[in-house]
Regions:
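Conserved C-terminal beta-signal and adjacent last beta-strands/turns
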Residues: 64-177
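Gram-negative outer-membrane beta-barrel transporters
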Residues: 6-106
Length: 177
């Protein structure tokens, strides 16, 4: 939606949307010290509202067109090394890597406008590292994480740029049994 040269976002509820897709997942664990896994997702979400809302005769320009602002191909992978009973029985050190890939997709309806000048959420590939030390069989946990360690340009679904490389720390105490 444009108003005086400025772009605004808006929400629209669609009554008939069909989603088809698949998810492939794989996880391999070796001897409690290494695991690797990943997923690949392909989702096709289309507008099946044949007529414009509130009318009975005007056909929708978006009938059977892929819904805007939704990624339809994305994947992630992860790998973790675990050192069980490190220093003390019941403690575990875990070093992990994970990444996320997402193809580029249109911010607005793909059937409207010139393909060369469309607003697109760009393809993204992020990489993260983590280090976690769990003590007393999971009662205490200290974690450090570096998200987007390659400092890639990443965007959310509204094509707003996310923060670059970021570092996080966490200390957790489990008060249950």
């Amino acid at each position: 939606m444009y108003w005086g040269g400025t772009s605004y976002g808006y929400y629209e509820n669609h009554g008939h949307v069909r989603t088809k897709g698949y998810n492939l997942s794989l996880l391999y664990s070796f001897s409690h010290w290494f695991d690797v896994g990943g997923t690949f997702n392909c989702i096709d979400t289309r507008d099946y509202e044949k007529y414009l809302a509130g009318t009975s005769l005007q056909e929708s320009m978006h009938y059977k067109v892929r819904m805007p602002n939704l990624p339809y191909r994305y994947a992630n992978i992860n790998a973790n090394f675990h050192w069980n009973d490190l220093f003390i029985k019941g403690n575990v050190l875990t070093i992990g890597y994970d990444s996320y890939w997402q193809h580029d997709f249109p911010l607005y309806w793909e059937n409207i406008g010139d393909k060369d000048s469309k607003n697109m959420v760009p393809e993204q590939f992020s990489h993260n590292l983590s280090l976690s030390y769990t003590m007393k069989n999971g009662r205490y946990n200290v974690s450090f994480e570096c998200q987007n360690f390659t400092d890639a340009q990443l965007f959310d679904n509204f094509s707003l740029q996310k923060a670059g490389r970021a570092f996080y720390g966490k200390f957790r105490v489990f008060f249950g049994r």
